[in-house]
């Protein structure tokens, strides 16, 4: 839709923020599968959506603490960051992963300290070779007979 309107211009890219997808009840993992080539930056930000009989996605008249949808510190919300970082790694993502923090409960200094460590612990160091690379190297029949 939007890409069509801009003629799929090469400079039209995306800042991926899974917290907003949680609050919209969108599949943020499938979004990576669809748009991974356009994602150039990633806001590492958590959120939770806990709808009730009185409020859902749109609970804007409540304080942030009492809203059904609210931002949380990394790891305290509903975003599956292990899956996100795994998907980005599998697609060869080499863009920025930036902490964005707006928790309605936790102190900002705690959020920043914990957030930096959280991101560091989720970054995947990509392997240089597959676990079964040895399989294509051929077999030493005589050595195998000797071992057996």
Predicted feature locations:
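Acidic/histidine-rich catalytic cores of soluble enzymes
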Residues: 1-78, 130-131
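A structural alpha-helix within SAM-dependent methyltransferase catalytic domains
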Residues: 3-4, 36, 85-89, 116, ...
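A structural motif corresponding to the C-terminal end of an alpha-helix
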Residues: 6-9, 83-94, 126
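Residues at the N-termini of beta-strands
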Residues: 41, 95-96
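A short, acidic, flexible beta-alpha connecting loop/helix-capping segment that sits on the rim
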Residues: 99-107, 136
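C-terminal helical cap(s) of enzyme catalytic domains, especially alpha/beta-barrels
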Residues: 108-129
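Terminal-tail/helix-coil boundary detector
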Residues: 125-148
């Amino acid at each position: 839709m939007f890409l069509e309107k801009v003629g799929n211009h090469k400079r039209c890219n995306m800042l991926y923020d899974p917290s907003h997808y949680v609050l919209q009840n969108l599949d943020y993992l499938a979004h990576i599968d669809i748009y991974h080539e356009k994602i150039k930056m990633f806001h590492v930000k958590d959120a939770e959506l806990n709808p009730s009989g009185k409020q859902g996605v749109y609970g804007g008249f409540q304080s942030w603490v009492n809203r059904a949808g609210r931002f949380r510190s990394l790891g305290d919300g509903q975003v599956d960051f292990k899956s996100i970082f795994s998907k980005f790694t599998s697609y060869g993502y080499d863009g920025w992963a930036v902490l964005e923090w707006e928790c309605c409960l936790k102190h900002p200094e705690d959020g920043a300290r914990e957030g930096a460590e959280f991101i560091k612990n989720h970054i995947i160091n990509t392997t240089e070779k597959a676990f079964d690379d040895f399989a294509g190297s051929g077999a030493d029949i005589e050595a195998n007979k000797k071992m057996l």
